[in-house]
Amino acid sequence: RTTDYIYCSVVFEEGQKSYYYLTEDDSIKIGDFVLVPAGKDNHEAVVQVVDIEYFFAEDVPLPAEKTKHIIRKCTDEDFDLPKPE
């Protein structure tokens, strides 16, 4: 990877406005669910990645220092899914 920043566009609900979050995890793919800090109180929220863009520092769409970071990729435990028997 030769770019400085990975910006992921995420949606909180399907069809809603997308928001940029930064990540250093280049294993995240479009369609993945990730955990992010959301709102003024930075509560944790599960969102879906709808686009991934790579930028050099001079080309970032939002200042990196003002952009929140993805916490991590989601696991089954984040969805409280029943375990298969």
Describe the predicted segments one by one:
Residues R1-Y19, D25-D26, I30-E85:
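Terminal, basic amphipathic appendages of nucleotide-handling enzymes
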